[in-house]
Regions:
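N-terminal active-site beta-alpha-beta segment that forms phosphate/nucleotide-binding
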Residues: 1-110
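Surface-exposed, charge/polar-rich loops and edge strands
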Residues: 4, 11-15, 110-114, 124-127, ...
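Redox-cofactor binding/interface segments in oxidoreductases and associated redox assembly factors
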Residues: 46, 117, 173
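Charged helix-capping and loop-helix junction motifs
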Residues: 61, 130-135
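Short glycine/serine/threonine-biased micro-segments
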Residues: 95, 124, 128-132
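Active-site and channel-lining beta-strand-loop segments
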Residues: 119-122
Length: 175
C-alpha cells in the first residue's frame, strides 16, 4: 500500500507544471514563515530539495535573511542522520544523488527549534510516507521541537501509519 502510494505520488510530483509549481512554492513559503513555529525559531533545519519537491532554496534564503541559523541533514548507513550548519560552499553529492554537507560536525538536536520535514505522501494527522529509509522517523522519535512540512495538494492522501511513524506537528498546504 505505502509503496504503491509513494510511486503514484512521485509520478504526480515529477510531472508538475514548473510555472504552477513555482507559484505554489512561493505561496507555501509565505504560509510557512507566517507560522509562530517559524517566527519563534532561532535554529531551523531543512533539506536540499530535489526538483520535484518543494523548493527549499526559498526557505533557505528567507531564513538566512531573517537571521536564523540554518541546518541541513547528512545521512549515514544504518539509517543514522545528523544536522550540520548550512555552508553552500561545502556541499557534496551522495551516491543517491542527494546534496549533503561535507562536514560531520553535528548540531545537538536539543539546539534545533524547528525541522522542515520532507515527505512524499501526508495524511490529515501529519503522518508521512517518505522515501522509505526511515531517517526522519528515527531522528524525530525523541525530538522535542517543532516540525512542519510543505505539501502539494497531490501529496494529501488517507493511509494508515505504522507504529513507528512519527507525525509532523504542522502541514502547510494549499487548496
Amino acid at each position: 500500500m505505502k509503496n504503491e502510494l509513494r510511486k503514484t505520488v512521485l509520478a504526480q510530483l515529477t510531472s508538475q507544471d514548473p510555472e504552477t509549481k513555482a507559484k505554489i512554492d512561493q505561496y507555501l513559503l509565505e504560509q510557512l514563515i507566517a507560522l509562530p513555529a517559524y517566527k519563534d525559531a532561532q535554529v531551523i533545519a531543512t533539506y536540499l530539495s530535489f526538483p520535484h519537491e518543494y523548493d527549499t532554496s526559498l526557505l533557505i534564503n528567507q531564513a538566512l535573511k531573517d537571521g536564523k541559523r540554518l541546518l541541513i541533514p547528512k545521512t549515514y548507513k544504518q539509517g543514522r542522520m545528523i544536522f550540520v550548519d548550512y555552508d553552500p560552499g561545502n556541499i557534496v553529492a551522495t551516491s543517491f544523488g542527494l546534496m549533503e554537507p561535507a562536514s560531520d560536525l553535528a548540531v545537538d538536536k536539543s539546539e534545533i527549534d524547528l525541522i522542515h520535514v520532507p515527505g512524499v505522501v501526508f495524511n490529515d494527522e501529519g503522518y508521512r510516507i517518505g522515501y522509505g529509509a526511515g531517517y526522519y522517523d528515527r531522528f524525530l522519535s525523541d525530538f522535542e521541537g517543532e516540525t512542519v512540512s510543505t505539501v502539494y495538494p497531490c501529496q494529501k492522501h488517507d493511509f494508515q501509519p505504522d507504529s513507528y511513524d512519527i507525525p509532523v506537528k504542522e502541514v502547510v498546504t494549499c487548496k
